Each structure stands twice: as structure tokens, then as C-alpha cells.
């Protein structure tokens, strides 16, 4: 349910325990409804499956408010406990320097909160936050950018960003049509006005698409942490911490491979 095996849960529990200001289990008085391990299964499982708090409450036979409280409390600690596994910009630059890089933009969907018009992503026809994903030619993710409002298109996310600095160190970069206009990213040919693409242009686009396939698979794999794939339902102010926790858990799990 948590997306982690027993060994991985052991380590997460150890890391979170070190971050707690007070012991989870008190020596006296009323005890918490769930053990720390159970609460971490809920918190990590919420990131993995994005099923409702009500269902988690039924699974553990507690109130929904208890589940919500534990997720709220433990998510920042999971974020902190897995932070070292999230690749930083310098680490990504070192990994991709002189090599071929792939880049893709993606959306992390969320509810349509009233008054948050900047979350509307016209390309996806829904609301959410967007990031850029950088991989090597094999599709290994080397960098996930911080999320920005969904109304920012890929070129806007790229301009002046850490991603741009990383990609400019690569030996070559391949992206989709969203990156047309840069002088360092190879993209498909856009259909010109007034005519169809020539056969050689179709062939070229197919080659670019084939080379880009690993980054698309990598994004799909990242989104097996379903909180990144289906609508984020918790309060908007909690999204960034939840996002970082989910990304951290993804790379934490990979470290056991």
C-alpha cells in the first residue's frame, strides 16, 4: 500500500524518527491511534495511490480527521528525510555534461480551486502545476524542476531556469515542439502554414520522436506515484511539500535497485 517494501519502510521510519521533536509513542497518557510505521504507510501510500482519506480511515479503522492529521504532520518529515535523494542542479549538470540529454514538460494535475486561474494549463485543458524533466539517453531521470503554475508553457519554464543551465552543458539536447525557438534543443519540425510537411520532414520528426521515447517513459514511471498523476485534492498550500515528498520517495526507492 505504501509503495515501499519492508526494508525501505524500515529506513524511512528510522529517518523520520530522527526528525521527530518528541517520541511518537509517549510513556504515559493517551497513545496515538496508529503506530509510526502505520502512519508512514498511510502518508507514503497517499503519495503512491492518491486514494481518499476516507478509504485510508476505513482500512485502519480510524476517523478521517486522524488520517488527515497524520498526513499533514508526516509529509514534511518525509520530504526532509528523502531530500538527499532528489538530484540537485549541480548533480544533474555533472551527470549530463557532454552527454545527450532529453527534456520534457509535464503537468501535475490538481483541483480547480476558485481564484487560482494561473493553474489552468491550456495545453492539457485542466489545472495543475508544471515541471521540466531531464533524462539521459537511456531515460534515467537526472533532474525534476520545482513546480510552477500550470499556465506557464515549457519555454517559459525553461527561460533563465536551472534546467536551461543544465541543458546547455549537455553534448546535445532533444525535446518536443514545445521547445522550438531555442538554439540548443533539437526539436521536431513544425508544420508550416500553407503546405503539408515533406516526406523527409515526416521522417525527421519520427526520428526525433523515437529518440524522445525514453523521457516519455520516465515521466510515466515517475507518475506511478499517483499523487503526481491524478488530481491533487489536499489544500493548495500543501502541494509543494507533497510534491517534494513524492519525488523524494521516487528517488529513494530507486536507490535500493
Predicted features by range, described:
Residues 5, 35, 198-200:
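Ser/Thr-centered flexible coil motifs
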Residues 23-28, 50-57:
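Glycine-/proline-rich flexible loop or hinge segments
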Residues 27-28, 37-39, 203-204:
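A short, structure-level motif marking secondary-structure boundaries and short turns
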Residues 35-50:
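Short, amphipathic alpha-helical "recognition" segments used to contact nucleic acids or chromatin
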Residues 52-257:
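Short, well-ordered secondary-structure "scaffold" segments embedded in the functional core
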Amino acid at each position: 500500500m505504501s509503495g515501499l517494501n519492508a526494508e525501505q519502510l524500515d529506513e524511512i521510519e528510522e529517518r523520520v524518527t530522527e526528525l521527530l521533536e518528541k517520541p511518537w509513542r509517549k510513556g504515559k497518557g493517551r497513545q496515538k491511534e496508529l503506530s509510526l510505521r502505520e502512519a508512514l504507510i498511510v502518508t507514503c501510500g497517499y503519495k503512491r495511490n492518491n486514494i481518499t482519506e476516507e478509504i485510508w480511515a476505513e482500512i485502519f479503522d480510524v476517523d478521517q480527521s486522524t488520517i488527515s492529521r497524520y498526513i499533514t504532520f508526516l509529509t514534511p518529515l518525509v520530504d526532509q528525510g528523502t531530500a538527499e535523494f532528489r538530484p540537485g542542479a549541480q548533480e544533474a549538470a555533472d551527470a549530463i555534461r557532454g552527454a545527450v540529454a532529453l527534456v520534457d514538460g509535464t503537468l501535475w494535475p490538481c483541483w480547480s480551486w476558485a481564484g487560482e486561474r494561473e493553474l489552468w494549463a491550456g495545453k492539457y485543458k485542466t489545472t495543475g502545476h508544471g515541471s521540466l524533466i531531464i533524462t539521459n539517453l537511456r531515460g534515467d531521470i537526472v533532474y525534476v524542476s520545482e513546480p510552477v503554475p500550470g499556465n506557464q508553457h515549457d519555454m517559459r519554464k525553461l527561460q533563465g531556469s536551472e534546467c536551461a543551465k543544465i541543458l546547455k552543458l549537455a553534448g546535445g539536447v532533444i525535446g518536443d515542439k514545445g521547445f522550438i525557438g531555442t538554439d540548443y534543443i533539437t526539436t521536431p519540425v513544425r508544420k508550416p502554414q500553407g503546405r503539408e510537411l515533406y516526406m523527409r520532414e515526416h521522417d525527421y520528426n519520427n526520428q526525433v520522436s523515437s529518440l524522445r521515447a525514453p523521457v516519455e517513459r520516465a515521466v510515466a514511471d515517475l507518475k506511478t506515484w499517483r499523487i503526481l498523476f491524478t488530481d491533487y485534492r489536499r489544500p493548495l498550500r500543501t502541494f509543494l511539500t507533497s510534491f517534494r515528498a513524492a519525488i523524494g520517495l521516487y528517488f529513494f526507492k530507486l536507490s535500493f535497485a
